[in-house]
Curated annotation (Swiss-Prot):
It is found in: Nucleus; Cytoplasm; Mitochondrion; Mitochondrion matrix. One of its GO terms (cellular component) is cytosol. This is Thymidylate synthase. There is a cross-link at residues 287, 292, 308 (Glycyl lysine isopeptide (Lys-Gly) (interchain with G-Cter in SUMO2)). The gene is TYMS. Its EC number is 2.1.1.45. Pathway: Pyrimidine metabolism; dTTP biosynthesis. It is linked to Dyskeratosis congenita, digenic: A form of dyskeratosis congenita, a rare multisystem disorder caused by defective telomere maintenance. It is characterized by progressive bone marrow failure, and the clinical triad of reticulated skin hyperpigmentation, nail dystrophy, and mucosal leukoplakia. Common but variable features include premature graying, aplastic anemia, low platelets, osteoporosis, pulmonary fibrosis, and liver fibrosis among others. Early mortality is often associated with bone marrow failure, infections, fatal pulmonary complications, or malignancy.
Amino acid sequence: MPVAGSELPRRPLPPAAQERDAEPRPPHGELQYLGQIQHILRCGVRKDDRTGTGTLSVFGMQARYSLRDEFPLLTTKRVFWKGVLEELLWFIKGSTNAKELSSKGVKIWDANGSRDFLDSLGFSTREEGDLGPVYGFQWRHFGAEYRDMESDYSGQGVDQLQRVIDTIKTNPDDRRIIMCAWNPRDLPLMALPPCHALCQFYVVNSELSCQLYQRSGDMGLGVPFNIASYALLTYMIAHITGLKPGDFIHTLGDAHIYLNHIEPLKIQLQREPRPFPKLRILRKVEKIDDFKAEDFQIEGYNPHPTIKMEMAV
């Protein structure tokens, strides 16, 4: 029997045993979204809504998605990446013209900017496509007086987005790094009040994280889009400020499933998540306004097929 300290060297563990001894891998981030869908289907309360479609609704949900070397573009159905990217660039530009986005092949705001829809809200003198002071206007010109989608608002109102970036650079421990699209004075002028209303940024260990408060979440169509959009915004701001992306925390108020989305979502729940893709920014960009669609590349996105769901207007 060997004396203490003279034990023979241990044989290396076989690969399977090494895996067992290693740190357990965290569960796939998409399982949080699928779990939210299951919870709403099981526990949601039947509620009427503005669109007349009807929903199952739960109040108050949260999920946390890692942005470290992965990008939360859901895989249990194909998410319209071009739409996510072009809409965010359109917000950053401060545009409120739905036709501008539509001209790039992204039609997601067409219904809310249509002649019939604007007329139904009493905006009969407003040009078709003019959504009013929605997200982009509030991000870049909060407090300015809105006239129309063609006016030049340079230097007017508070540029919340640039203020966020400047504060991250100069005072990253600040607890007030907030951007808010909910402007009570302007709500009556909007074709659609903001669903994703407020986001806050947080810096620690050279990582940038973002938490979004979304007052209203269409779980089938909108929420997968919103997750990717604010994850992308976090990547962009991290790039400009010399930080690494950390987490995206998604807090939902009224989390709902439209009744006509129940069957499509049951199909989605039967699918196994695949690895999230990676997002590459292909050149060094110094200013948020200088980003272009061709600066971004999604790698390794291998989703399940598209699932058709109708938008409630």
